Amino acid sequence: AYSDTPARDNFAGDGRTVQYREGLYVGYRYHQTAGVAPAYPFGFGLSYTTFAYADVKATPQGVSLTVTNTGARDGAEIVQVYVAKPDAKIFRPAQELKGFAKVQLAAGESKRVTVALDDKAFRYWNTMTNAWEVEGGSYEVRVGASCEDIRLTAVVTVAGTGAPNPYEGKSLPHYTSGKVQNVPDAEWETLLGRPIPDDTVKIDRNMTLGELNHSRSPLCWLIWNPLCRKSSCMP
C-alpha cells in the first residue's frame, strides 16, 4: 500500500520544493533495510521449472556460478547479484542489486553464468569530497532469484579510497536503520547540511494561482480557497 512506502509523507510535494527524505531507501532497498515485507519481493518471478545454484566464485570484478535446470521443462532464470556491507560505517541499504543475467536452460541442463561488476558496484556519493568514493573492507556478494531468495554468498575484499566519513559524529538514527518514515525536521536538516527551504512565497506579479496557497497573506488564502474548491483540489 502507498501508506507503507517511505515517501508517503512527502510525495507529491505541493509546494515550491519536494523533499526526498527517503534518501537511498527506495523500493526493495527500503523494505529490506527497514524490515517491511512486501507482498512480492523485488526480482520475484514464477516458472514452470526449478533451478539450482552452485559453485560460486567472486572477485571485485565479477561473480560466476553454475545454474542447473532441475525440473522437467525447459525454462529461463534471471540470476541476480546483490552487494552488501554488513559492517559499513557509511549508512546504506542492506543490499543493492549490482548486476543480473538471464540464462536459458533445457530440462536437466547446466550452464556457467558470469555477471560482471564494474567500478560502480561498491561506491557511494561522499558529500564532503563531492565525489564517488569506495569504503574499503569486506563485502558480501549475494546471488539469488530475488532480493529475498538468496542462494549463494561470497566475500570479497575491496580497496577503499580513504575518504572521510561525511556522517561521522552526526545523529541520523532513521537513516542508519533505514526506517525513514516520519524523519524529523532536525535530522533531515542534519543530513541535508542546511535548513529546510522555506516554501512560503513573496507576493508579486510573477506568482501563480497555485502558489497562493503557500503565501502567509490572508488575502491570498481568500482568493485561493474558492478557486481550489471549484477545481476540486480540496475535498
Q: Which sequence ranges carry the predicted segments?
A:
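Intrinsic-disorder/low-complexity, polar/charged segments enriched in Ser/Thr/Lys/Arg/Asp/Glu/Gln
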Residues: Q61-G62, S110-R112, R151
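Short flexible coil/turn linkers enriched for glycine and charged/polar residues
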Residues: G71-G75, A107-E109, E148
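Intrinsically disordered, low-complexity Pro/Gly/Ser/Thr-rich segments with frequent PxxP/GP/PP motifs
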Residues: K89-T127
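Terminal connector regions
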Residues: D118-P166
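C-terminal non-catalytic accessory extensions
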Residues: M234-P235
